[in-house]
Curated annotation (Swiss-Prot):
Alphabetical keyword list: Methyltransferase, S-adenosyl-L-methionine, Transferase, Ubiquinone biosynthesis
Protein residues bound to S-adenosyl-L-methionine: R44, G63, D84, M128
InterPro entries reported for this sequence: SAM-dependent_MTases_sf (IPR029063), UbiG_MeTrfase (IPR010233)
Designated name of the protein: Ubiquinone biosynthesis O-methyltransferase
Keyword Methyltransferase belongs to the record: yes
Family recorded in the similarity comment: Belongs to the methyltransferase superfamily. UbiG/COQ3 family.
Organism phylogeny: Bacteria, Pseudomonadati, Pseudomonadota, Gammaproteobacteria, Lysobacterales
HAMAP family: UbiG
GO molecular function: 2-polyprenyl-6-hydroxyphenol methylase activity; 3-demethylubiquinol 3-O-methyltransferase activity; polyprenyldihydroxybenzoate methyltransferase activity
Functional description taken from the UniProt entry: O-methyltransferase that catalyzes the 2 O-methylation steps in the ubiquinone biosynthetic pathway.
Keyword hit for S-adenosyl-L-methionine: yes
Length: 239
């Protein structure tokens, strides 16, 4: 598939793609609309690198956006393929990679389409802050599982569907502190860890860990936490 064509898979909300595409030009601005994501990125990277030797690993970053995590993993030696359905974001990611001299294979492609082409090709797949933005997150997980080699690792992050998550990630972050643009998140699409665990089992993946991720807006820092009420990370393995 040409890396700039519209994907065949329809597992996306066009309104979501448009919303994030509008942020493309400031994706790499650490003080811009994606400021919290910049704070979360080192935590995500540490979570992955603690469980996977990135040097030489073939890694797929699903829903890569402007390439924050993709570039970070490539800097640690991973051979990264990164996909997103928003052409504007992929363009920004490619340009930033050129400016930073970091090599990542960026594509406008769905994970479902890629799974049909490259089954069992990757040592690891990352899918961060994406599942809560698609109509069928279970299809994303199944496609990620297909793309993994036996023994391959899947890393996920998402938002829990709890009153705390609604208060902090929606009301607090979008309407009070205005850390994120309004409409970034939809509470009904948040995912409980038990739901995620069931989806992983159905995809024949073994859940190994669930860890909370705490964002401290007053310091603009994030860290791992034992509390999973708002943001959390998960790690699963393909037998």
């Amino acid at each position: 598939m040409n890396s700039n064509t519209q994907p065949a898979s329809g597992n996306f909300h066009q309104s979501e793609l448009d919303k994030f595409a509008a942020l493309a030009n400031r994706w790499w601005d650490a003080d811009g609309p994606q400021k919290p994501l910049h704070a979360l990125n080192p935590v995500r990277l540490d979570y992955v690198s603690a469980r996977l030797d990135l040097a030489g690993a073939r890694v797929l970053d699903v829903g890569c956006g402007g390439g924050l995590l993709s570039e970070s993993m490539a800097r640690l030696g991973a051979q990264v393929t990164a996909i997103d359905l928003a052409p504007e974001l992929v363009k920004v990611a490619r340009l930033h990679g050129l400016e930073s001299s970091v090599q990542v294979d960026y594509r406008v492609q769905s994970v479902e389409d890629l799974a049909a082409e490259q089954t069992g090709s990757f040592d690891a797949v990352t899918c961060m802050e994406m599942l809560e933005h698609v109509p069928d997150p279970t299809a994303i997980i199944r496609a990620c599982a297909r793309l993994l080699k036996p023994g391959g690792k899947l890393f996920l992050s998402t938002l829990n569907r709890t009153p705390a998550a609604f208060a902090l990630a929606v009301v607090g972050a979008e309407y009070i502190a205005r850390l994120l643009p309004r409409g970034t998140h939809h509470y009904k699409d948040f995912i409980k860890p038990a739901e995620l665990a069931a989806w992983l089992r159905n995809a024949e993946l073994q859940l190994e860990d669930v860890s909370g991720m705490l964002y401290e807006p007053w310091r603009n820092r994030a860290r791992l936490s034992s509390r999973t009420e708002v943001n959390y990370l998960a790690y699963a393995v393909k037998p």
